[in-house]
Amino acid sequence: MEALRQRIEAAFEARAEITPATVEPSVRADVEKAIAMLDTGEARVAEKINGEWHVHQWLKKAVLLSFRIFDNGVIEGAETKYFDKVPMKFADYDEARFRKEAIRVVPPAAVRKGSFIGKNTVLMPSYVNLGAFVDEGTMVDTWATVGSCAQIGKNVHLSGGVGIGGVLEPLQAGPTIIEDNCFIGARSEIVEGVIVEEGSVISMGVYIGQSTRIFDRETGEVHYGRVPAGSVVVAGNLPSKCGTYSLYAAIIVKKVDAKTRGKVGINELLRIVD
């Protein structure tokens, strides 16, 4: 894999000269291999090592190179046709393969090739972009979007209309990450490389980016870019220093452990007790 990484890095430096007509066959083959590794889960854009998330930028570079290398083509759909550079992940699947991988895909869900979908996942009519990683047992509900290179953990529920932001550029930016056993409420948006740590519950209509204040009402601490593990978060506001206005914030109303979360329903967790 190290040799492949080095070749992808070198090709990326010369990307301005690369087009579908001029690309070297060896470069095309390397990019195709990297995309295939993302597609099968053999490689992923980000992974947790010793408790810290590490981003493999060369895989993002491979994804970006693919847009320069591959030309648009017709993609056949059940109800219509499409015209794009990236083929659909399930275009060549048959019943046996769907059953083997234990994936449910409800039409018209769209999943681009180069994204990984783990076993026992359910994809309602939703969208998963290339480079994304969706782990086992996760539900991607209706009209939810998993952006490019986003990392979704095991047993996550992305409710209807949820947006998980993608990140290809700027290149140095980290992907948006939802860790294992999280619940993201309907119409919430988690973007700009924010990390929602394990076992957290995000209520309906919560918007979190890198500049969003995440206020823990129990401790008074303010977080940016990270929702601590086991947090229950709702949309709210914090007053200005002068007291004349308030600005949006995400509010951590309580913390729960796995045992409590297993016994208590999501709706009950989201009840705010003053």
Curated annotation (Swiss-Prot):
GO biological process: diaminopimelate biosynthetic process; lysine biosynthetic process via diaminopimelate
Catalytic activity of the protein: (S)-2,3,4,5-tetrahydrodipicolinate + succinyl-CoA + H2O = (S)-2-succinylamino-6-oxoheptanedioate + CoA
Subcellular localization: Cytoplasm
Key words, A-Z: Acyltransferase, Amino-acid biosynthesis, Cytoplasm, Diaminopimelate biosynthesis, Lysine biosynthesis, Repeat, Transferase
Record pathway: Amino-acid biosynthesis; L-lysine biosynthesis via DAP pathway; LL-2,6-diaminopimelate from (S)-tetrahydrodipicolinate (succinylase route): step 1/3
Signal peptide (residue range): none
Disulfide bonds: none
PANTHER family referenced in this protein's UniProt entry, alphabetically: 2,3,4,5-TETRAHYDROPYRIDINE-2,6-DICARBOXYLATE N-SUCCINYLTRANSFERASE, MOLYBDENUM COFACTOR GUANYLYLTRANSFERASE
HAMAP family named among the record's database cross-references: DapD
Full protein name: 2,3,4,5-tetrahydropyridine-2,6-dicarboxylate N-succinyltransferase
Source organism of this protein record: Shewanella pealeana (strain ATCC 700345 / ANG-SQ1)
